[in-house]
């Protein structure tokens, strides 16, 4: 297996023949033509180089359409049963709840974890090494529930140490959820042990450090895995970190307004997440399309006037060297001139000439590999004009 942390020398000789794209256990995580960091038009030739492409999905996505074999997967929200901890990292309240599923799995459809467990077995690996709760295929649902119960037990143990009672597993799995914020006498703040209690940070100085001694040491470059001085994995550092410096420095944005390419592509694109989707997920939901949410490119009145008097609802062509897309315009004074907005997660729907009429922001994104930590997938430079053709 070769990934982004691999020795660069391996990658130069890497010539893959087969791709199994599972994308984890969440459906929106495996539509990579829309959600990955490279342009859709540049990913497709890479897919077509594969002699064999297997895609595991719960919905038919643009990526899935390129697969040689499609394996149906249980949907993690509607068909699986999962303990979910979420909310806090996305600006909401921190909560722990149980997704019990709302429909039974169709036919013999299996979960991602079952498939990976069986793959491990076929490769000669003890399946319990991958999923320790596994006993037999017939007992899979019971094995999975034991796994979820153990996950929840960690929650109850955590609160028991603080003398806080939480719902039993039986109550929790039948609808009660935990609002973590309500269980704390005071709002949660990070690093209380260090800042309020005087406990040293796990750094060389024991204080917050703004300089990475690890990155400064060139002997560490090229390793497959990186660990800090206390043995913790640095899981977001690539094998070769390129021009990354050990301390923060200002750099001009790649494909930003300081880029000389603005002479050819004078508009900067922002691609925020839509309120009505999770990445690509829910694009196919008619209740959230047209009536509630309309997938349009936002453009300022000043930029609309200088481009032939573009009006609300006019079809426009957005393009750069990465690709072309066509979508309706939304003219609004909420944007400054020189900036347009296309929401992330639109469906990639190219015509015979490669023009994307689903208007996925990924079509025009990509090509920025300056940062090995966070390849930018939120901004780029484009030109925009009235579309003169007909929609397919």
Language-model regions: role of each:
Residues 9, 32-33, 85, 89, ...:
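Hydrophobic alpha-helical scaffolding
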Residues 14, 65-66, 90-98, 377:
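Short, solvent-exposed loop/turn segments at the edges of secondary structure
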Residues 100-170, 282-392:
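Long, contiguous, secondary-structure-rich segments that constitute the structural scaffold
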């Amino acid at each position: 297996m070769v990934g982004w942390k691999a020795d660069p020398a391996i990658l130069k000789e890497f010539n893959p023949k087969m791709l199994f794209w599972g994308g984890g256990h969440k459906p929106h995580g495996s539509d990579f033509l829309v959600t990955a960091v490279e342009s859709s038009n540049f990913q497709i030739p890479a897919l077509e180089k594969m002699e064999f492409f297997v895609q595991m999905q719960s919905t038919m996505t643009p990526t899935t359409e390129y697969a040689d074999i499609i394996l149906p997967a249980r949907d993690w929200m509607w068909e699986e049963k999962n303990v979910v901890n979420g909310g806090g990292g996305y600006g909401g309240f921190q909560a722990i709840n149980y997704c019990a599923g709302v429909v039974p799995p169709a036919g013999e459809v299996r979960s991602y974890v079952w498939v990976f467990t069986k793959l491990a077995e076929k490769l000669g690996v003890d399946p319990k090494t991958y999923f320790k709760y596994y006993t037999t295929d017939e007992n899979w649902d019971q094995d999975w529930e034991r796994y979820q119960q153990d996950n929840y037990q960690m929650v109850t143990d955590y609160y028991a140490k603080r003398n806080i009672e939480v719902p039993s597993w039986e109550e929790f799995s039948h609808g009660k959820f935990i609002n973590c914020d309500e269980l704390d006498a005071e709002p949660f703040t990070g690093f209380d042990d260090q800042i309020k209690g005087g406990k040293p940070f796990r750094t060389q100085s024991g204080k917050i450090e703004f300089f990475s001694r690890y990155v400064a040491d060139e002997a560490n470059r090229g390793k497959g895995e990186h660990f800090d001085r206390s043995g913790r994995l640095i899981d977001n550092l690539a094998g070769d970190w390129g021009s990354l410096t050990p301390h923060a420095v200002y750099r001009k944005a790649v494909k930003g307004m300081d880029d000389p390419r603005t002479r050819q592509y004078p508009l900067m694109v922002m691609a925020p997440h839509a309120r009505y989707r999770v990445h690509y997920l829910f694009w196919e939901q008619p209740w959230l399309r047209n009536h509630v949410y309309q997938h349009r490119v936002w453009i300022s009145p000043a930029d609309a006037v200088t481009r032939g008097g573009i009006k609300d609802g006019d079809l426009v062509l957005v393009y750069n060297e990465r690709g072309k897309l066509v979508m309706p315009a939304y003219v609004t004074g909420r944007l400054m001139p020189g900036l347009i907005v296309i929401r992330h997660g639109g469906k990639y729907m190219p015509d015979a000439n490669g023009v994307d009429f689903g208007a996925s922001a990924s079509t025009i994104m990509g090509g920025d590999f300056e940062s090995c930590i966070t390849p930018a997938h939120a901004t780029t430079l484009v030109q925009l004009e009235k579309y003169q053709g007909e929609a397919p």
